[in-house]
Amino acid sequence: MSTSITNDFETRRYRLTDVARAGDAATRTPIYSTESTSGVVWVLKPGQEIKPHGHAKADDIWICIQGEGVFYPAPGEERPIAKGDVIVSAKGMCHGMKNTGTEDFIFVGILAPVPAD
């Protein structure tokens, strides 16, 4: 699920309480997009996941804000992640995650360059 891009370049500030939304599946809310990068806020309820995938032309950086889960650095491989962690996946590298905790898992994703694929 995805909503519209905010692109609030007047204040250049986004409040998680205003943009973080949970849904029936992992929910991606775009907050900005420029010619070179894009930023999103992801919310995963307990048990929800982002399947392992990669981007042919872009790096993807995840800044973990809340919760705990497992990161998929490769299909079939898991590593624990939690609030305060930063995940860096260079172009072509596999990444995905699952919320294994009891609260929503929230992270900010920065993708560059765009388009990613």
Report each predicted region and the residues it spans:
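A short, N-terminal "cap"/entry segment at the start of jelly-roll beta-barrel domains
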Residues: 1-38, 51
